[in-house]
C-alpha cells in the first residue's frame, strides 16, 4: 500500500480547520477537549485513507474473513495507539509543540471506551490488533455500550460506583453506519402459514422490535497500513415516540420503544441476581447474535 508522508504544515492546518468546523472557534479559543476532538478527526482522516485501501485490497484478493465475536472489547485509548501504529506519533507531537500544544495533555482528554471489563475484553482487543498487524482480513463484532461497567470513586472511605458516560462528548474514532441497520424482534408468537406453492412459512406476530445500528471503529495494524474493523451494535427504537399515547396521558407507553432499546445497551453484564436482570442479559445476548 502507498506510504503515508507526514506533512507538518498540512497537519496543523487540518487541526485548525477541524476546530473551526466542529466548534466555530479558533485554536486559541478551543478547550483541551475540543482540541482533542480536532486532533483525533485529523488522525482519523489519515486512517480512513488506509481503511479504504485495505477494503479495496481485500475485495480484490477475496481472502477468508475472520469474525471475532465478543460481548466485550477492552480497546483502551485510541488516539495515541493509532498514531504509534501509523508511525506518526513523534511527528504529530513536534507539530503540536510548534503551536503551543502538549500532546500528553491532549491524550488525557480521551475517555477509555467502556466496551469491556477485564481479561476477556483485553484478549479480544489484542487479537484484533494482532490480526491487523499480521495483515489478516478480520472483523470484530460487539455491542456499543453507553456506560460499559462503571467508574470508581472513593467517598467517606468507601468505593462508590457511578456510570461511566464515555460518549458524553461524542467519540471521534467511530463511524455510524445506518445503511446496515437491522430489525431485531422480541416476544410475540409464531404462526405457520402454507403458501400457494405448498410451502410452510412462519410469521412472527405481536412482537416488540428494536433497530440494531452498527458503528465502525478502525483497528490499525502496526506500520503496514492495514486497517481492520470493529463493528459495534447500538440499539435504537423503531419508533422513537408515540404521540398518540402521549396525547392520551400514557407517557410511559409513549417512550416504551425507546426504553426497550436503551436498556439493551446501557451496561455490560447487567446485574442478574433477579428475574428482570436475567431477562435483560438474555435479550442483550439475543440482540447481539441477531445483529
Question: How should each PLM-predicted stretch be described?
Answer:
Residues 1-291:
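A conserved ligand/cofactor-binding region detector
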Amino acid at each position: 500500500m502507498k506510504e503515508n508522508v507526514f506533512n507538518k504544515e498540512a497537519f496543523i492546518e487540518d487541526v485548525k480547520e477541524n476546530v473551526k468546523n466542529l466548534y466555530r472557534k479558533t485554536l486559541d479559543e478551543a478547550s483541551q477537549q475540543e482540541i482533542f476532538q480536532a486532533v483525533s478527526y485529523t488522525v482519523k482522516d489519515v486512517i480512513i485513507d488506509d481503511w479504504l485501501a485495505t477494503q479495496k485490497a481485500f475485495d480484490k484478493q477475496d481472502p477468508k474473513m475472520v469474525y471475532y465475536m465478543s460481548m466485550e472489547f477492552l480497546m483502551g485509548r485510541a488516539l495515541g495507539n493509532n498514531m504509534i501504529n501509523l508511525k506518526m506519533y513523534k511527528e504529530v507531537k513536534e507539530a503540536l509543540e510548534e503551536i503551543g500544544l502538549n500532546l500528553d495533555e491532549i491524550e488525557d482528554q480521551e475517555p477509555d471506551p467502556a466496551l469491556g471489563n477485564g481479561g476477556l475484553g483485553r484478549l479480544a482487543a489484542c487479537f484484533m490488533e494482532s490480526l491487523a498487524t499480521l495483515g489478516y482480513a478480520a472483523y470484530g463484532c460487539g455491542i456499543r455500550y453507553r456506560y460499559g461497567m462503571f467508574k470508581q470513586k472513593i467517598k467517606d472511605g468507601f468505593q462508590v460506583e457511578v456510570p461511566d458516560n464515555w460518549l458524553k462528548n461524542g467519540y471521534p474514532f467511530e463511524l455510524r453506519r445506518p445503511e446496515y441497520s437491522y430489525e431485531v424482534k422480541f416476544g410475540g408468537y409464531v404462526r405457520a402459514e402454507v403458501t400457494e406453492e405448498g410451502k410452510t412459512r412462519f410469521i412472527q406476530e405481536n412482537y416488540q422490535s428494536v433497530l440494531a445500528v452498527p458503528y465502525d471503529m478502525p483497528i490499525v495494524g502496526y506500520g503496514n497500513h492495514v486497517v481492520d474493523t470493529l463493528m459495534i451494535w447500538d440499539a435504537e427504537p423503531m419508533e422513537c415516540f408515540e404521540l398518540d399515547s402521549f396525547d392520551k396521558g400514557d407517557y410511559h407507553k409513549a417512550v416504551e420503544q425507546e426504553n426497550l432499546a436503551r436498556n439493551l445497551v446501557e451496561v455490560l453484564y447487567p446485574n442478574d441476581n433477579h428475574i428482570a436482570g436475567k431477562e435483560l442479559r438474555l435479550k442483550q445476548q439475543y440482540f447481539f447474535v441477531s445483529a
